[in-house]
Design a protein with these regions (language model features):
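Short beta-strand->loop micro-motif that forms the acidic, two-metal-ion catalytic signature
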Residues: 39-43
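Catalytic core of pol beta-like nucleotidyltransferases
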Residues: 1-22, 30-35, 45-152
């Protein structure tokens, strides 16, 4: 996976330049170890509107999918820092990061912000249901935090 990560970083640095803040891999390819696609969350400094967001997401998908000859399919999600911070709450799509994520590039210490969200999530009662099953995100967040504490 390291080769994949470094290629992703290089391509996104080239495409986004200094706007690139963080890259986070998440989704079933991370928490199950396999999946149809690789979900990638890209944080940039700012987005001027929905049109730019959609345009950038499409450019990223095309760039990555072509670069990997469609052998690996990428699903890109782009947020600016404000949107990222707004989504660090229980019930947002970022709650799913508790199932598994990997920060592969970071200029803004997003790991700390995600850990804070996991702490809040671990104290709540939140269940997520998706096509892979029913997930007690509160319990999973609690376990992830214990593992992180052990590893540091």
């Amino acid at each position: 996976m390291k080769g994949l990560e470094s290629r992703i970083i290089r391509m996104l640095e080239t495409l986004l330049g200094t706007r690139l803040v963080s890259i986070i891999l998440f989704g079933s390819s991370i928490y199950i170890g396999r999946g149809r696609d690789v979900d990638i969350l890209i944080l940039i400094d700012s987005i001027s509107g929905l049109d730019e967001k959609m345009d950038l997401e499409e450019k990223v998908k095309m760039l990555l999918n072509r670069s990997f000859n469609y052998e690996v399919v990428f699903d890109a999600h782009i947020l600016d820092l404000e949107q990222f911070n707004e989504n660090l709450k229980i019930g947002s799509f970022l709650s799913g990061l508790s199932l598994g994520y990997q920060v592969i590039y970071d200029k803004n210490n997003v790991e700390e912000k995600i850990v804070e969200m996991l702490k809040t999530l671990s104290k709540s009662r939140y269940i997520m249901v998706n096509k892979y099953g029913r997930w007690n995100l509160s319990k999973i967040a609690e376990i992830k935090l214990r593992i992180k504490e052990k590893n540091h």
